[in-house]
């Protein structure tokens, strides 16, 4: 700020904001004033002509007093608005700023008075006798005897101009403080200000290194105004320079916190390693520190980004054997999200609703012991045979539950996976906690559950096959689980092969080739996506005699056009 007071009130920023508000309000108050005058005139016309009384044949005598009150109110509002407009127009808030501040504040030349920095500095800086505690020492060098109240600050003219290179300093003689002081972030902060020579100044022209403690408090006033009541804070006029300045000072503060005794010496300044010096120049400094081996990080050697990159490259190599279009991998995340959504909305949500409906029917029929999630799979299969006419969907539901003896966990986990729309609780290599007990390998993983319900759903969509009387046409033809192994030598084998149980890993077998996508949380989804993509591109969208497109299962929409 370019004011001469110690604590200006209001500040330059506040006055600038107020001036902008006045400029914006000038047009608004004028409009309101004209509106109030118009309303008052209309009411006065009605009072004199009695238009309402004549037109509506109203003789209510308080009406005139109501109109008088409204006319008076609008008139007073109009007078107040015109007074504000006159005040903002005739006597607006004016500012005295430097050209740099005018540019930063975005002020128009018509509303400010621009004063050259030299004149402003000349009106603020007055010579004063030097303090004995700083006589004969560097202006910005550290002195243990210096009291906190005498810490030097930048003058208002210190920051009026910046240069990309350090201004030269005179090495001899005495100098007087110049209002054209320049600051350079390239100097490494070992030199900060330039002084013009004059025999009247008691201060040396050399400037020592900047201390790293109390950094921001030490760069605020000229050397001739440590305790002067006219010294004033200033703002840097360039954001890039300010950022560079603060970053370098924070680096120096960090060196001080490390406990280095030479942190304030020129050798440990930010430019210490920028000079062309030999190793011998650092011998005295380096021998003070003991060489220690760094602790080995507990994190894995390859971070997540590197693992993802390797996984993506491996996936590209596998997909390149299926299609030459390498841009497909750019859509893989979108395909995976759509596929998860399809499984949730098409299989899991309807399955949970049907299970709850069947359980309700069982209770109404007086069979509470056959509640799904409590009864065993064997009991449910027998009930499906006996009560098939009453509950025809029970047999289809039992096929989805024929995965693990722990029916309660399976049902609860399917309910959890059906929530959220996109299986947000899915965990590829484990499952959910059950009755306060953490998941263990005696329970199926989420990948196993999703693969089972997916295969069972397609079993229900494919027509019956005489070779598979149990109705598991898709599962028997297109899914193989270890310890069983597919016949890779058979060209007609087209299946998903689960080669590992914990953690689960899936591979695709197609035309005597094994396509093994990268392991991890998306292995199952990506393998199934490749399975469906081959059906779409190489099998014309047909899985046997069933169309997986719009006219059939309607799952190939996830690939778009």
From Swiss-Prot:
Q: Which UniProt keywords apply?
A: Cytoplasm, Glycoprotein, Golgi apparatus, Membrane, Nucleus, Phosphoprotein, Transmembrane, Transmembrane helix
Where found? Membrane; Nucleus envelope; Golgi apparatus; Cytoplasm
Q: Which cysteines are joined by disulfide bonds?
A: none
Say yes or no: keyword Transmembrane present. Answer: yes
Question: What is this entry's stated membrane topology?
Answer: Multi-pass membrane protein
Annotated region (Disordered) at 120-156, 196-233, 250-270
Modified residues annotated as Phosphoserine in this record:
9, 11, 98, 201, 248, 278
InterPro entries, alphabetized: Cytochrome_B561-rel (IPR019176)
Q: Where does the source fall among the domains of life? A: Eukaryota
Task: Give yes or no: UniProt keyword Transmembrane.
Answer: yes
UniProt GO cellular component terms: Golgi apparatus; membrane; nuclear envelope
Residues modified by glycosylation: 57, 274
Q: Which residues cross the membrane?
A: 28-48, 60-80
What residue stretch is flagged as signal peptide?
Answer: none
- Comp. bias regions, Low complexity: 138-152, 260-270
Q: Quaternary form?
A: Interacts with NUP205.
Described function: Nuclear envelope protein which in association with NUP205, may be involved in nuclear transport of various nuclear proteins in addition to MYC.
Name it. Answer: Transmembrane protein 209
**Origin species:** Rattus norvegicus
Q: What is the lineage of its organism?
A: Eukaryota, Metazoa, Chordata, Craniata, Vertebrata
């Amino acid at each position: 700020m370019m004011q001469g007071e110690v604590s200006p009130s209001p500040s330059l920023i506040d006055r600038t904001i107020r001036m902008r508000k006045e400029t914006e309000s000038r047009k608004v108050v004028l409009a309101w004033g004209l509106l109030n005058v118009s309303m008052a005139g209309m009411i006065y016309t009605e009072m004199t002509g009695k238009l309402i009384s004549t037109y509506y044949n109203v003789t209510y005598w308080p009406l005139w007093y109501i109109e008088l009150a409204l006319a008076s109110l609008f008139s007073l509002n109009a007078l107040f608005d015109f007074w504000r407009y006159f005040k903002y127009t005739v006597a607006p808030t004016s500012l005295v700023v430097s050209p740099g501040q005018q540019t930063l504040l975005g002020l128009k030349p018509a509303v400010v008075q621009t004063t050259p920095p030299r004149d402003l500095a000349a009106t603020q800086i007055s010579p004063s006798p030097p303090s004995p505690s700083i006589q004969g020492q560097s202006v910005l060098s550290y002195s243990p005897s210096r009291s906190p109240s005498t810490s030097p600050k930048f003058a208002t003219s210190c920051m009026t101009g910046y240069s990309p290179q350090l201004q030269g300093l005179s090495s001899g003689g005495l100098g007087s403080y110049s209002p054209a002081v320049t600051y350079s972030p390239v100097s490494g902060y070992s030199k900060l200000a330039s002084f013009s020579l004059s025999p009247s100044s008691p201060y040396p022209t050399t400037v020592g290194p900047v201390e790293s403690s109390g950094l921001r408090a030490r760069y605020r006033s000229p050397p001739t105004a440590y305790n002067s009541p006219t010294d004033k804070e200033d703002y840097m006029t360039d954001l890039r320079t300010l950022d560079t300045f603060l970053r370098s000072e924070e680096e120096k503060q960090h060196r001080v916190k490390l406990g280095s005794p030479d942190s304030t010496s020129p050798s440990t300044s930010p430019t210490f390693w920028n000079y062309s010096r030999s190793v011998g120049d650092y011998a005295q400094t380096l021998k003070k520190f003991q060489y220690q081996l760094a602790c080995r990080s507990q994190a894995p050697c390859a971070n997540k980004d590197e693992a993802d990159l390797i996984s993506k490259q491996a996936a590209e190599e596998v997909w390149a054997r299926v299609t030459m279009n390498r841009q497909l991998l750019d859509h893989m995340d979108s395909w995976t999200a759509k596929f998860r959504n399809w499984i949730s909305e098409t299989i899991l949500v309807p399955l949970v609703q049907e299970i709850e409906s069947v359980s309700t029917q069982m209770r109404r029929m007086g069979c509470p012991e056959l509640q799904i999630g409590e009864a065993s799979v064997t009991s449910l299969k027998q009930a499906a045979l006996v009560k098939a006419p009453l509950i025809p969907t029970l047999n289809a539901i039992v096929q989805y539950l024929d995965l693990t003896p722990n029916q309660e966990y399976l049902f609860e986990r399917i309910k959890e996976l059906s929530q959220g729309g996109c299986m947000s609780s899915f965990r590829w290599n484990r499952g959910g906690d059950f009755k306060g007990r953490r998941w263990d390998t005696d329970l199926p993983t989420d990948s196993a559950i999703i693969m089972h319900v997916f295969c069972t759903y397609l079993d229900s969509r494919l027509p019956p096959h005489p070779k598979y009387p149990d109705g598991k046409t898709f599962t028997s033809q297109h899914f193989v689980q270890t310890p069983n192994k597919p016949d890779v030598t058979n060209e007609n084998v087209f299946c998903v092969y689960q080669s590992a149980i914990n953690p689960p890993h899936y591979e695709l077998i197609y035309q005597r080739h094994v396509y093994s996508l990268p392991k991890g949380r998306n292995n199952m989804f990506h393998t199934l996506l490749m399975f469906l993509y081959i059906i779409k591109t190489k099998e014309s969208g047909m899985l046997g005699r069933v169309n997986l497109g719009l006219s059939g299962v309607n799952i190939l929409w996830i690939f778009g056009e």
